Amino acid sequence: SALNPVFDRRVCVSRELLERGIAVDYLDLVAHDADLETEAYLAGLPVRSIVAADASREPFWELGERRTVDVGRYDVILQRKDPPVDDLFVRHHRHFIAAPESILQINRPPATYELSEHTIGMRYPEFSAPTVVCSSFEELVAAVRDQDGEAVCKPKNTYCGIGVSFVPSDAEEHVLRAYWNQWAPEVIVQAYLPAIEDSGDLRILTLGDQVLGSVLRVPADGSRLANLHQGATAARLEPTPRQLACCAEVSADLNPLGLHLLGLDFIGEHLTEVNFTSPTTLVQINQVNGIRADRVMVDQLERMRAG
């Protein structure tokens, strides 16, 4: 499988697990049949052992021969899926609802595909940026017009900043119509937060009740997109007490749903998104803070597994 250890936590976490003598297997869903009956699907996972993992050289990891195992042999399953949440992901992931409750799944379906990362912040109005989900062109126009000067429009099911647009609140209707035609049937409108220009976008990564670390994403010159895939750079910034209070509230709410590993995004003091299908930046957290957040993550996994 192709890996990019600049963004992908799998290499550093696998290395830490192997250094502790913990066996790690890798399941590539492309090699499995999503249309199997659930019992057969879970009893016949085509996995390969991860023999070695090292982000400093290629290949970044070494895999053993493929073999078939039953899901019940595992203590922890770490799921990772680059957005968007598509039909193939759901068809695979729904099978894991039936996995034994004794297995710690990071993160567990069906919440992984029933909830939206872009809108889940609306559950926490005390902390979140003002957000409207528009399911018609008329709603989009009204939401944009309601903003003070500028609105942030984003598709509901994209990633890496794809489709994010900064729109004047008095934009002509043909501009909004073109955006709607491209990204319908649902578009999210958020208030524009000027803090993005001064202080970027802070990602705080949590696992259970443990904060793994944080990293500030600073937009490139001339850009307002604070996404590392869109040219932003990583920098160090400590979370504020209010941001940490938000993390605690969100974790306490979502952990019981099976969403344990979370990437919370803040512009200033406002929560803008909560990532749970593929929350990255563990590598950048290590780099800018000079820590080993992967070790903290594995420590927390062991505590959570022990109950």
Where are these regions (language model features)?
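Conserved N-proximal alpha/beta basic substrate-recognition cap immediately N-terminal to
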Residues: 2-21, 25-133, 139
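Residue-level detector of anion-binding/catalytic polar loops
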Residues: 23, 104, 150, 210, ...
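Phosphate-binding site of ATP-dependent enzymes
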Residues: 137-138, 147-150, 157-246, 250
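Flexible, charged surface loops at secondary-structure boundaries
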Residues: 69-74, 145-147, 182
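ATP-dependent carboxylate activation and anion-phosphoryl transfer catalytic cores
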Residues: 238-307
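Conserved residues at the C-terminal ends of beta-strands
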Residues: 80, 217, 277
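Short glycine-enriched loops at secondary-structure junctions
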Residues: 109-113, 217-220, 267-270
